[in-house]
């Protein structure tokens, strides 16, 4: 049996977003499910936009998610190989030179659209005479090169969508070499997939038409096309996710919002499948449950709040032994097991544990806040008798309202400030049981 080899091929022109990472996850999981290999390739032939800082950030995000690669390379390191294939395809008459300027191509596109026609290249350059070609060269025009798509049916069995068919006549010949000599994604990708023995490619359904063309490229190079699977796109409020949608970058999720690696991995590896989205604690467990056949053909809706809820479920499921190393990573190694077990049900983000510790173990200095001391002392006297529980807050505030007439912010904010020293933070109903009765009274009467 052929060894399974998958790849993830980001362009280092920006940070990874949730759509990218879903593709990376599924390719990694598919490879590991079949005891195969996962290759990281950087499609960095766009010299103007590709940056080393993005390569470093992409690697950092993948490592954070435990998506370790077996091999990595950059397309820029393979330019001589691409030139070799370019010459081969020129000899086979599957590449041809074109001399239109970007402005001329844009005029053609607008004209076709004005006639209600799809914007397809008209193959005018195939009919250039030697004299016309020489004239363009004398004008200083550098040619770009297109791949000649055969006008015949193209079909393949997609791992997710099933049987797919295209008419080659409906596909425009793509530019594969720019006028400056740099290569575009289309042909380079096929050359790499052949040379690195890629067996399976899972990517977004916005690549389906590219796949149809690339199948002909495989065949033009006398190779059997790899097996493809096309995922439905992730959408948020009827828009597909892209690099330019703020708030959906992986670095934002992990560094600014504080989502755990396994919450991200669990969520996006199950999103769009028939499997229930659960907070898995390890990549091994995700591998065991992974089935590419479970993914739907329908668009996949991403709601950020769903990811945050899954993050909460993951945190409350973690025993102290499972989280103590993570606590060290956020400089919270002082958290002990008893405190973790007490505070765990209230956590939305792991970093919140530091706020809870500070609130529960340090009497806040609120002298500068000029709080209404008479009101706070009255509130202390109305504190319910007996053990402090989560129900104590609602009982207490109802009694305060009955006696003082205070409601809303006028009631809540002075109590929060006196008890925590902060205008916002964890729910006071959750904080109270973690502070002794004596400490609550002390904070209220000394404010």
Swiss-Prot record:
Residues holding ATP: 243
Tell me its EC number(s), please. 6.1.1.17
Q: Which UniProt keywords apply?
A: Aminoacyl-tRNA synthetase, ATP-binding, Cytoplasm, Ligase, Nucleotide-binding, Protein biosynthesis
Q: Return the motif ranges for 'HIGH' region.
A: 10-20
Name the reaction it catalyses: tRNA(Glu) + L-glutamate + ATP = L-glutamyl-tRNA(Glu) + AMP + diphosphate
Q: Among its keywords, does the record have Protein biosynthesis?
A: yes
In Gene Ontology terms, what is one molecular function of this protein? Answer: tRNA binding
Q: Where in the cell is it found?
A: Cytoplasm
GO process annotations (BP): glutamyl-tRNA aminoacylation
Where in this protein would one find the motif 'KMSKS' region, according to its record? 240-244
> Origin, by domain of life?
Bacteria
The protein's assembly and partners: Monomer.
- What family name appears in the similarity comment? Belongs to the class-I aminoacyl-tRNA synthetase family. Glutamate--tRNA ligase type 1 subfamily.
For this protein, the record's HAMAP family field holds: Glu_tRNA_synth_type1
Matching NCBIfam families, A to Z? Answer: gltX_bact (TIGR00464)
Q: What is this protein called?
A: Glutamate--tRNA ligase 1
- Biological classification of the source: Bacteria, Pseudomonadati, Pseudomonadota, Alphaproteobacteria, Rickettsiales
